[in-house]
UniProtKB/Swiss-Prot annotation:
Top-rank taxon, per record: Bacteria
Keyword Ligase: yes
Gene (UniProt): gatB
Organism: Lachnoclostridium phytofermentans (strain ATCC 700394 / DSM 18823 / ISDg) (Clostridium phytofermentans)
Subunit: Heterotrimer of A, B and C subunits.
Official protein name in the record: Aspartyl/glutamyl-tRNA(Asn/Gln) amidotransferase subunit B
Reaction(s) catalysed (UniProt annotation): L-glutamyl-tRNA(Gln) + L-glutamine + ATP + H2O = L-glutaminyl-tRNA(Gln) + L-glutamate + ADP + phosphate + H(+); L-aspartyl-tRNA(Asn) + L-glutamine + ATP + H2O = L-asparaginyl-tRNA(Asn) + L-glutamate + ADP + phosphate + 2 H(+)
Cross-referenced Gene3D superfamilies: 1.10.10.410, GatB domain, N-terminal subdomain
Length: 478
């Protein structure tokens, strides 16, 4: 029986977080009125000339440096020629011959095993528009707002062998880009899109099989399902003695299957030639040094620092730094209350629970560090217990309420008057004569029962140590 292995490479398109487009001053803001964020340059009108956005180049270099790439000191743009309704110029300005970054790598880890994935190249290009089908008029409309939005395309080597490795690679890539501030990587808004190049070969076979390209996956889960589906499809073809056709396929996640879109093109099919309206770029060592000097602390370094500086478990540090937003909330809160372990515990337990219940992503979390820190200080000062703190934290999570105001408004503060506690216990003892008798006869469980009844009567708003002390005193006199 033949044993096959899957060979996978990725082309990841990343929308850059610049304020304006790559060759004009139009906004890159997502959404908005149809065809409102475009100009004659975006639309490819005759006589218009592009002006390169410097920030795009800096973002591309920053990404390349973080992925251990060689930076091309003299690079240029090329025209990729093809016709499609969402491409008004009938060509895309991209980079083929001299991409800005080459020969990089990033390290992933799957099931405790580390592996280096090669980065073939990173190149800059402009995005195309968006086609919208109108079912009522039975026609397709074009929104050009996305035309000219700056992209980098990160092309991996075919080094991945499973869906698990692909997801680990994408998650690592996403974190690098988010920590750099290069992109928000929101797949639901199309700012991170991955095309899968997949082929099958027998284990030990040095030559690659015929590859197909998979498109239209809008989540990591969909990508994993698409890989598994295409892997099975190609193996079935080979087992039946058929050939795999080199083509581009569209994944339908609802039907859990893919459909052929078109034959897979090679570079020569696009008739690339140097972009005549943009001069070649020269990237100096001084500029590279400046960009490298602005590089923020990335996820791996931050995770190690959390373990060493804050003394939180490595697992917790990994989860917290696995979201840039969560890491930012953690550090901002710790800077206000100086309780890193407490902050970590609340993020790991209550925050994760509430995120799961609300089906919310950690990157969408809007948790006020000031309110979070205030809550921890209230617990530390003994002004509320942990049961009440959970209730208050849930309100901070949902509506970012001020914990002090919420506690006062709902009367949740701890009872500090020992007289009130004493009076409550006296009533409990009168109502539970049998338990008092049991305690007197050496049944220790009766004491715990009386403590529980007191806490219940006081809605958990009394200090347990104060309850224990007064209860023992009153029982000794009973």
């Amino acid at each position: 029986m033949k044993v096959y292995e899957t060979v996978i490479g990725l082309e990841v398109h990343v929308e850059l977080a610049t304020k304006s487009k790559i060759f004009c001053g139009c906004t890159t803001q997502f959404g908005g009125e149809v065809n409102a964020h475009c100009c004659p340059i975006c639309m490819g009108m005759p006589g218009t000339l592009p002006v390169l956005n410097k920030k795009v180049v800096e973002f591309a270099i920053a990404a390349g440096l973080a992925m251990n790439c060689d930076i091309t000191k003299n690079c240029k743009f090329d025209r990729k020629n093809y016709f499609y309704p969402d491409l008004p110029k009938a060509y895309q300005v991209s980079q083929l011959y001299l991409p800005i970054c080459r020969n990089g790598s990033i390290e992933i880890e799957v099931d405790g095993i580390k592996k280096s994935i090669g980065i073939h190249e990173i190149h800059m290009e402009e995005d195309a528009g968006k086609l919208v089908h109108d079912p009522w008029e039975d026609c397709t409309l074009v929104d050009y707002n996305r035309c000219g939005v700056p992209l980098i395309e990160i092309v991996s080597e075919p080094d991945m062998r499973s869906a698990e490795e692909v997801i680990a690679y994408l998650e690592k890539l996403k974190l690098i880009l988010q920590y750099l501030g290069v992109s928000d990587c929101k797949m639901q808004e199309g700012s991170l899109r991955a095309d899968i190049n997949l082929s099958i070969r027998e284990v030990g076979e040095p030559e690659f099989g015929t590859r197909t390209e998979m498109k239209n996956m809008n989540s990591f889960k969909a990508i994993a399902r698409a890989i598994e589906g295409e892997r099975k499809r190609q193996i079935e073809l080979l087992e039946d003695g058929k050939k795999v056709i080199q083509e581009t396929r569209r994944w339908d996640d609802n039907k859990d299957t893919s459909f052929a879109m078109r034959s897979k093109e090679d570079a020569q099919d696009y008739r690339y030639f140097p972009e005549p309206d943009l001069v070649p770029m020269e990237i100096s060592e001084e500029w590279l040094t400046e960009i490298k000097g602005r590089e923020p602390e990335l996820r791996d370094a931050k995770m190690l620092r959390y373990v060493k500086e804050y003394e939180i478990p490595e697992y917790d540090a990994g989860i917290i730094t696995g979201s840039k937003n969560l890491a930012d909330i953690f550090e901002a809160t710790v800077s206000l209350c100086n309780k890193p372990k407490e902050v970590s515990n609340w993020l790991m337990v209550e925050t994760m629970r509430l995120l799961k219940e609300s089906e919310q992503d950690a990157e969408e979390l809007k948790l006020s560090p000031a309110n979070f820190a205030s809550l921890i200080e209230l617990i530390d000062a003994g002004k509320i217990n942990r049961t009440i703190a959970k209730e208050v934290f849930e309100q901070i999570f949902k509506a970012n309420v001020d914990p002090n105001a919420y506690i006062e408004e709902h009367g949740l503060g701890m009872v500090s008057d020992d007289g009130v506690v004493r009076s409550t216990i006296e009533n409990i003892l009168k109502e539970n004569v049998q338990s008092v008798s049991d305690y007197k006869n050496g049944k220790d469980k009766a004491f715990g029962f009386l403590v529980g009844q007191t806490m219940k009567a006081m809605r958990g708003k009394a200090n347990p140590s104060v309850i224990n002390e007064i209860l023992r005193e009153l029982l000794s006199k009973a």
